[in-house]
């Protein structure tokens, strides 16, 4: 039992190291933009390239984790991420920055399904929610700790955080190769089964309906989240330090819930009801922000919205992992694909809506999330009828 917990924590720690590395570089992106004389379009391209690479690579990565093993994919993801951060730190031209971001997206595609599947392999259904809460907490923790540490490290040079991120990922690679043990449930699938495996998953209406919900909800979440800082500044006059405080408090709140309360909530109401609750809560409080002029109300509503977002993701992952059977990698790979697709479209749509009217992203996000909540409830009824 202790050995199993150690292996789970080691796998999850890789995600912590990666997202700590991602968080480290956040404070230095604005000065790097100025140093390299990059346009906003160039910086946006770097974000999009990462997401597109992750989108394209996720299905294959999920299948490969079932075929060749979680450990190999986790280790490969860590070394690719390490190289991508090192390359970004050394880059002097746009093309190299773009290549670095593409490699980072591929690394994320390799890591997310593999770590999630690894954790699912080593946990019982009763243990699953708590373990998936830890997976999400590792991501949240990296984003919370990273920017503060990155701001301090950047005093030694604005590219130093990239080198530190590369080093952290390399440490994770070494630990994965030398200490992490392969899970016993890894499948050995013949090549002919690859296509039929994905087709079987996508032909299953219960999985497909949930993937549609994931896609639509990711679009709505990112339409709000991606330009929150800009909207808060222009619409309500928040300073950057105030926005940073709101986001930090939101992250700490999410971390607490993911680590200590997520499994209790799932035990009480179940993953599907939690998913419904997060949709309706986020839609309601986004609408509150859209129609209030009170800054305190905006801040408190933001806490609820970001908490709902951070409970939705592990709830979906937990539910999928409980029904994935021997296709943990493939299912989680498709989950990452549909999430990435929504993450790409959401910010683009939000930016265009913001140019038309500064409050349009609020209205559209609230409508989409409320509609997705209704859709997910209807689909839940069908799942119950199908005993899924």
Predicted regions and their residues:
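Conserved MFS/SLC helix-loop-helix module at the cytosolic interface between two early adjacent transmembrane helices
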Residues: 56-92
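Helix-to-loop junctions at the C-terminal end of transmembrane segments
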Residues: 58-69, 257-270, 354
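Cytoplasmic helix-loop-helix junction between adjacent transmembrane helices
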Residues: 100-141
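Helix-loop-helix hairpin linking two adjacent transmembrane segments in secondary transporters
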Residues: 134-177
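C-terminal transmembrane helical hairpin of 12-TM major facilitator-type secondary transporters
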Residues: 272-316
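Short amphipathic helix-loop junctions that connect adjacent transmembrane helices
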Residues: 27-40, 227-242
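Paired small-residue
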Residues: 84, 95-103, 296-304
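Juxtamembrane intracellular "pre-TM" segments in multi-pass secondary transporters
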Residues: 1-4, 181-211
């Amino acid at each position: 039992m202790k050995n199993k917990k150690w292996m789970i924590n080691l796998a999850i720690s890789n995600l912590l190291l990666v997202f700590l590395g991602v968080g480290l570089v956040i404070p230095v992106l604005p000065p790097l933009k100025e140093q390299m004389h990059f346009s906003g379009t160039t910086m946006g391209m770097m974000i999009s390239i990462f997401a597109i690479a992750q989108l394209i690579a996720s299905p294959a990565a999920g299948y490969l984790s079932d075929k060749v093993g979680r450990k190999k994919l986790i280790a490969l993801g860590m070394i690719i991420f390490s190289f991508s951060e090192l390359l970004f730190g050394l880059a002097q031209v746009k093309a190299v920055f773009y290549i670095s971001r593409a490699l980072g997206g591929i690394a994320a595609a390799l890591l997310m399904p593999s770590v999630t599947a690894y954790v699912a392999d080593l946990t019982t259904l009763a243990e699953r929610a708590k373990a998936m809460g830890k997976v999400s907490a590792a991501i949240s923790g990296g984003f919370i700790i990273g920017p503060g540490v990155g701001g301090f490290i950047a005093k030694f040079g604005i590219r130093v955080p990239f080198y530190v991120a590369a080093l952290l990922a390399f440490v994770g690679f070494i630990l994965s190769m030398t200490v992490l043990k392969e899970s016993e449930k890894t499948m050995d699938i013949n090549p002919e089964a690859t296509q039929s495996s994905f087709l079987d998953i996508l032909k299953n209406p219960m999985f497909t309906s949930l993937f549609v919900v994931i896609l639509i909800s990711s679009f709505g979440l990112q339409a709000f989240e991606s330009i929150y800082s800009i909207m808060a500044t222009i619409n309500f006059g928040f300073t950057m330090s105030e926005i940073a405080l709101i986001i930090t408090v939101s992250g700490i709140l999410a971390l607490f819930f993911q680590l200590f309360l997520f499994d209790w909530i799932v035990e009480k109401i179940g993953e599907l009801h939690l998913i419904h609750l997060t949709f309706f809560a986020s839609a309601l409080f986004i609408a509150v922000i859209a129609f209030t002029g009170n800054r305190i109300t905006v801040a408190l509503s933001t806490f609820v919205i970001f908490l709902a977002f951070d409970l939705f993701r592990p709830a979906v992952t937990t539910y999928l992992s409980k029904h994935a059977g021997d296709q943990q990698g493939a299912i989680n790979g498709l989950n990452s694909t549909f999430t990435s697709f929504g993450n790409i479209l959401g910010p683009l749509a939000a930016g265009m809506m913001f140019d038309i009217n500064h409050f349009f992203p609020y209205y559209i996000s609230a409508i989409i999330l409320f509609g997705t909540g209704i859709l997910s409830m209807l689909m839940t009824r069908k799942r119950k009828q199908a005993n899924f």
